[in-house]
């Protein structure tokens, strides 16, 4: 995909659900800068009547956070793209901050948002005034991978994000102790980060054919696109000559995203990603890092399955 001067700087994609409070939509529309909002609703949902030329409302052919997110991403026209959820609040100045970041770090692929998490129902903290953001990001101290001290991030350093170590060899020990090469400052997930959209669109075209199983039968990763897309992008653009390439930074506080915990009746559960990551393996079988991930998921399958059965028995 090529971009002209007429396209928005940032596309913000949000999968929607029924009953999103009007206050959330009002907060979203307070976001400043050259931005397009792509709100993607489940089938048969009623669209909001909002007069805002920055707003594009779509209806996904399938219900589900990830199916809706995928629909939005395929329609994103901005130079950069960001996804988050419809129960999360974003700092109004994020688009302009992202502009400054990519001007000052033009080789970066990704800017990871700092976030603050709150217990369910803490509306006072969620709606508190936002803090001022730095003008010159290049003047911030940087926590580099070579420093070997990730704690520097907590003291106000920007954290370097190296590319995922795709070159790692397959580790047979994953079968009995699980994988360990996921630990470190690199990122696996796609969500809550500002990405170069040209790379995102190229990666989507890379993985979409992998959704085909047998003939017309398709597999749609209803809850697994996050890590699938994040790692597929890094695998597609991985340069073996630069195994420690820095592809972006995680910004320090103040928080750019506020995340409210789920209500007690909808507590977060561990999700099983294997089927989505088989798509990743089919496309990039040459990387040991992905094999380690797959083996770890296979190893976890009995535990996750037993936990799911136990929850159903308790609920029933």
Please name every model-derived segment.
Residues 221-223, 227-238, 258-293:
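Catalytic core of nucleotide-sugar-dependent glycosyltransferases
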Residues 60-76:
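Glycine-rich, basic loop-to-helix element that forms the pyrophosphate-binding segment
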Residues 13-33:
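Short, well-formed alpha-helical segments that are part of the catalytic scaffolds
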Residues 118, 188-194, 198-223, 234-266:
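Active-site donor/metal-binding and catalytic loop motifs
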Residues 111-140:
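Short beta-strand-to-loop element that shapes/binds the nucleotide-sugar donor at the catalytic cleft/hinge
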Residues 143-199:
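A recurrent flexible, glycine/aromatic-enriched loop bordering the glycosyltransferase active site
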Residues 81:
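Short aromatic/hydrophobic "clamp" motif used to bind/position activated sugar donors
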């Amino acid at each position: 995909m090529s971009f002209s001067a007429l396209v928005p700087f940032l596309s913000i994609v949000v999968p929607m659900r029924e009953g999103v409070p009007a206050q959330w939509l009002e907060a979203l529309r307070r976001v400043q800068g050259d931005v397009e909002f792509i709100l993607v609703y489940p089938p048969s949902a009623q669209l909001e009547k909002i007069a805002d030329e920055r707003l594009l409302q779509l209806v996904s052919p399938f219900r589900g956070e990830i199916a809706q997110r995928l629909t939005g991403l395929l329609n994103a026209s901005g130079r950069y793209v960001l996804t988050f959820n419809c129960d999360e609040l974003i700092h109004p100045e994020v688009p302009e901050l992202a502009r400054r970041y990519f001007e000052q770090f033009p080789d970066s692929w990704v800017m990871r948002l700092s976030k603050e998490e709150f217990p369910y129902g803490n509306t006072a903290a969620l709606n508190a005034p936002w803090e001022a953001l730095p003008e010159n990001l290049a003047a911030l101290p940087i926590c580099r991978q070579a420093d070997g001290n990730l704690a520097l991030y907590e003291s106000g350093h920007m954290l370097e994000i190296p590319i995922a170590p795709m070159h790692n060899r397959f580790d047979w020990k994953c079968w009995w102790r699980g994988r360990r090469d996921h630990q470190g400052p690199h990122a696996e997930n796609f969500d809550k980060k500002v990405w170069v959209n040209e790379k995102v669109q190229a990666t989507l075209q890379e993985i979409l054919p992998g959704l085909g199983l047998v003939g017309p039968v398709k597999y749609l990763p209803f809850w697994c696109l996050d890590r699938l897309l994040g790692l597929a992008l890094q695998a597609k653009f991985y340069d073996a000559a630069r195994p420690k390439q820095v592809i972006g930074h995680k910004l320090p506080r103040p928080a750019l995203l506020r995340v409210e915990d789920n209500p007690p009746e909808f507590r977060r559960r561990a999700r099983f990603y294997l089927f989505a990551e088989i798509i990743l393996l089919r496309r990039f079988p040459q990387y040991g890092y992905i094999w380690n991930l797959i083996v770890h998921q296979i190893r976890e399958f009995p535990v996750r399955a037993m936990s799911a059965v136990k929850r159903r028995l308790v609920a029933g």
